[in-house]
Amino acid sequence: MGSRLLCWVLLCLLGAGPVKAGVTQTPRYLIKTRGQQVTLSCSPISGHRSVSWYQQTPGQGLQFLFEYFSETQRNKGNFPGRFSGRQFSNSRSEMNVSTLELGDSALYLCASSL
């Protein structure tokens, strides 16, 4: 009886499909070499005008990069000038890193808010 119930629960979960998180970040995965340039894109939740970017290097907590609100940079973390960003009139945002260095290997996240 127990294994039948577990199989049923798994089948129900598989049928549920993916849950949309709201914020879309592209590309999802990226591999670059030292010296190259990278651009990441973030589409916020509909109606959100603020977009923030974060970096998380292996074994470390999130580090704030910058925040944009209505196309204007409001806050900036303590990062080199190789890190830059912008926000468009539709609230979509891009983060750029020029001349990549080995220490730039990290998880980059964007978040949106009202």
UniProtKB/Swiss-Prot annotation:
Question: Quick one: signal sequence residues?
Answer: 1-21
Q: Name one GO biological process term.
A: cell surface receptor signaling pathway
Q: Which residues are glycosylated?
A: 96
What coarse category fits the chief subcellular location reported for this protein? Answer: membrane
Top-level taxon in the UniProt lineage: Eukaryota
Q: Which UniProt keywords apply?
A: Adaptive immunity, Cell membrane, Disulfide bond, Glycoprotein, Immunity, Immunoglobulin domain, Membrane, Receptor, Signal, T cell receptor
Ig-like domain: residues covered: 22-114
Enumerate the InterPro entries for this protein.
Answer: Ig-like_dom, Ig-like_dom_sf, Ig-like_fold, Ig_V-set, TCR_beta_variable
**Gene Ontology cellular component?**
plasma membrane; T cell receptor complex
Give all cystine bridges in this chain. 42-110
Cell location: Cell membrane
Function text = V region of the variable domain of T cell receptor (TR) beta chain that participates in the antigen recognition. Alpha-beta T cell receptors are antigen specific receptors which are essential to the immune response and are present on the cell surface of T lymphocytes. Recognize peptide-major histocompatibility (MH) (pMH) complexes that are displayed by antigen presenting cells (APC), a prerequisite for efficient T cell adaptive immunity against pathogens.
**Assembly, per entry:** Alpha-beta TR is a heterodimer composed of an alpha and beta chain; disulfide-linked. The alpha-beta TR is associated with the transmembrane signaling CD3 coreceptor proteins to form the TR-CD3 (TcR or TCR). The assembly of alpha-beta TR heterodimers with CD3 occurs in the endoplasmic reticulum where a single alpha-beta TR heterodimer associates with one CD3D-CD3E heterodimer, one CD3G-CD3E heterodimer and one CD247 homodimer forming a stable octameric structure. CD3D-CD3E and CD3G-CD3E heterodimers preferentially associate with TR alpha and TR beta chains, respectively.
Protein name, entry field: T cell receptor beta variable 5-1
Q: What species does this protein belong to?
A: Homo sapiens
Name of encoding gene: TRBV5-1
